[in-house]
Amino acid sequence: MRGSLQFLCDYFGITRQGYYKHVNRKMEIDILTSSIVLYCNELRKLMPKAGMRELYACCLRKFGVRMVIGRDQCYNIFRANGLCQRVRRVRPKTTNSNHNYYIYPDLLNVTPKFVADTFGSMVVADITYVATCQGWAYLSLLTDAGSRAIVGYALCKTLEAEGPLKALRMAMDFYNRYNVDLNNLIHHSDRGVQYCSNLYVGMLKKHHINISMTQCGDPLHNALAERMNNTIKNGWLFDCTDDSFEQLDKRIADAIYAYNYVRPHQGIQMRTPMEYIRKCSGKVAEVPLVGTGAPAPCREGDPRAKSFCYLMKVYSPKSCTYKRRYIILQNI
């Protein structure tokens, strides 16, 4: 027996308007679901190991008021489409504390505990290792504790102090561009021989940076730096065993750029680190960390910039300024 739509609506006690609204909403949900999957697949090219929280935060920024799907349903979409990632846990050890250098007091793990809640109040340092086809490479990272931004990095083939020194020079140049008073900055690290060496400590004292070091081998006393090692290695450098040292250096530059400008961070209300710095400093975040040494500009012909724009489905034929590049990233 066949009946008219009006008859069926009357029979079930609903209006024709309600029926069509239900049908249209289901179509909208299906279209949004497909868009979310396509968008997250593009994000995976840039952030291969990002968690579901980061993907969901990016979707909220991308779709705005059209994001009518809740968090749990969005997580189910990620699971159903293979967008969840399983992180392999590793615990590298690169600290050599068997030396005769002076170990400075710990200014972080005190009572009451020091909390770095502003940009430019504390920078944490650590070294981790990455496997390449040419052997081990050692990555030195400096992270601003308030904004979670990576402000300095260097990749070296040895564990000598030159790597941390290069990262420190980059970090000081970064802070100077944002008019951060280095006299109020605390540098916190483990008690490894690189950070206690005369060269490294001399550089810190020359710029009147306060020195803080852990007093034991507990990684929790430098937890943010250890966490940063895990984020960069398991988020971007998980499949680089076939890369050369030069290829790894480029991948690290791309990874840190994506971390600072694209990846939302739970500790700063799901903002990106450079968004947080812009909010604190009142200026547009202009200086991406690209390559080694001092931060370099984005020029036409820069393969790092072109590959990044391609991944985000944006092509800029003309030379772009930092501001325009930043806006492009915010509108993906």
Question: What is each PLM-predicted segment?
Answer:
Residues 9, 16-116, 218, 272-282:
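Basic, flexible linker segments flanking DNA-binding modules
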Residues 9, 19, 40, 55, ...:
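Mobile genetic element proteins and their domesticated derivatives, centered on retroelements
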Residues 198, 205-209, 231-332:
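C-terminal domain-tail junction helix/linker
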Residues 68-141, 166-170, 174-177, 181-184, ...:
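Mobile-element integrase/transposase regions
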Residues 144-145, 156-162:
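A short acidic/small-residue loop/turn micro-motif
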Residues 88-93, 186-191, 205-224, 240-245:
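RNase H-like polynucleotidyl transferase catalytic core
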Residues 179-197, 215, 222, 269-274:
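Acidic/histidine-rich, metal-coordinating catalytic segments
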Residues 1-8, 12:
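Double-stranded DNA-binding cores of transcription factors and transposases
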